[in-house]
Amino acid sequence: MVLMIVSGRSGSGKSVALRALEDMGFYCVDNLPVVLLPDLARTLADRQISAAVSIDVRNMPESPEIFEQAMNNLPDAFSPQLLFLDADRNTLIRRYSDTRRLHPLSSKNLSLESAIDKESDLLEPLRSRADLIVDTSEMSVHELAEMLRTRLLGKRERELTMVFESFGFKHGIPIDADYVFDVRFLPNPHWDPKLRPMTGLDKPVAAFLDRHTEVHNFIYQTRSYLELWLPMLETNNRSYLTVAIGCTGGKHRSVYIAEQLADYFRSRGKNVQSRHRTLEKRKT
């Protein structure tokens, strides 16, 4: 059974995540004191129910040692996983402005911006040990819920899930990436008027890139690098490995290469997911 601990900065989507987990059959508790986690787990162990608990600055333990002690006292039947949600500073400010809610750390002497920064410092111990960090800056409520369902329900027990995601540098680097590869030096289909409106998922774009030796070399060397270190990553008790491939706009080269890498590791029996940030954004 899984004990999913959901944390993150206020406004990043913890309530949405908790509702999505509840829909997946998790027993969800909002803001349970950390010291009570073992008691909750023991209560649910006999019922064979996975649990999800949110932790934020309101119920953060006074020291990291208290959190570690709670984790060590969990029943053996439970496997703890820490999900940390985040968003860029401007997005958090906009969300608070839209909802007109008060930040948990806001006060007469502390602005919203300062409260967000202070919260980041307080939550850093949890962020640093997270199994999965998700950037929700460009996600809608439904996209976040669907992403969690896909990743959690698609994950096989104790197996590393490899996530290959394409992005455009002009939109910013994904903060949830473990590795970032820049492919802006490769031949660009954008300069072919016929290929410009297409994406890296279309066959003419794939054929264009497939004609270039440097594209083949990059894919081969990147997958060789990942294969070299994958055994150590798999034994490092982590659930996800996110590999981000970036080109200028996130439409052609990065999409094609992310798909090629995903197909390769999928053919080797790995648990693989692919995501294309720019293409998904264009659909909304």
UniProtKB/Swiss-Prot annotation:
Positions of region (RNA-binding): 266-284
Gene3D superfamilies attached to this UniProt entry: P-loop containing nucleotide triphosphate hydrolases
Pfam families for the chain: PapZ_C, RapZ-like_N
Superkingdom: Bacteria
GO molecular function: ATP binding; GTP binding; RNA binding
Record-listed GTP binding positions: D56, V57, R58, N59
UniProt binding sites for ATP: G8, R9, S10, G11, S12, G13, K14, S15
GTP-binding as UniProt keyword: yes
Keyword set, alphabetical order: ATP-binding, GTP-binding, Nucleotide-binding, RNA-binding
UniProt keyword annotation of RNA-binding present: yes
Role this protein plays: Modulates the synthesis of GlmS, by affecting the processing and stability of the regulatory small RNA GlmZ. When glucosamine-6-phosphate (GlcN6P) concentrations are high in the cell, RapZ binds GlmZ and targets it to cleavage by RNase E. Consequently, GlmZ is inactivated and unable to activate GlmS synthesis. Under low GlcN6P concentrations, RapZ is sequestered and inactivated by an other regulatory small RNA, GlmY, preventing GlmZ degradation and leading to synthesis of GlmS.
Family the entry assigns: Belongs to the RapZ-like family. RapZ subfamily.
Subunit-structure text: Homotrimer.
Entry protein name: RNase adapter protein RapZ
Species assigned in the record: Salmonella arizonae (strain ATCC BAA-731 / CDC346-86 / RSK2980)
Lineage start: Bacteria, Pseudomonadati, Pseudomonadota, Gammaproteobacteria, Enterobacterales
Protein encoded by which gene: rapZ
